[in-house]
Amino acid sequence: GIGASRFTEPEKMADAVLGDFIGDAAAWADYLAGEGFRRVVLIGHSEGALIAFCAAQQTPKVAAVVSLAGAGYPLDEILQLQLASQLLPDNMDLLLQANAITAALKRGERVESCPPQLEALFHPSVQTFWISSLRYDPREEIRKVRVPILVVGGDNDLQVPPDNAEALAKAQPRARKAIIAGMTHPLKKCTGRMRIDQTGAYGDSTLPIDPDLVAVVTQFIRGL
């Protein structure tokens, strides 16, 4: 998910930019088409949705794009909301520092130091990736996609709330939209509306993907 445990080995990401992932996705689409797959559908989850939007612009081999819990606003806005939900009301100073760091990265400026609590998020070795990612607006990118699009959000997603799906659908009126009742950010069903209630959805690998999501995506692909 955006802004959470982004890199487990940050030193390996020192030179990576979002465009690398976009290029990889486009290359895979080309490869699969060359292997005889008649329709290649890119399905992106969370930040992967933005990658899918951009990759679909780079190759004619993509037949459709599916956005699952994808951000509908620029990354800095999403990050500010996520951090606010975690840090307020007790850590206002830390939130302000995080927002200042994010603003600097969006201007293309590297940050030499940050509070220890934010070190994992803004580690110097991943700042190049942050800077590249902050240049994109998902609403602008989805407007450029010319193939069929399905935008899916979960009404119990605490990381990327369903208004993000609404924003994407508004930016690209041709897109089909579906809001899945009870679906969380990890694409699993949960009735609890608090972060602590959703621990299982994030940590229990035995929980299945929301069957309503599977049905919606399957119907979309079969209809292409």
Model-identified regions with their sequence ranges:
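Cap/lid segment of the alpha/beta-hydrolase catalytic domain
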Residues: 1-19, 189-202
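Primarily recognizes the serine-hydrolase "nucleophile elbow" in alpha/beta-hydrolase
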Residues: 30-85
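Short beta-strand/loop motif that positions the catalytic acidic residue
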Residues: 145, 151-153
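Acidic catalytic loop of the alpha/beta-hydrolase fold
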Residues: 156-160, 185
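Catalytic active-site module of serine/aspartate enzymes centered on a nucleophile-bearing elbow/loop
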Residues: 186, 193-224
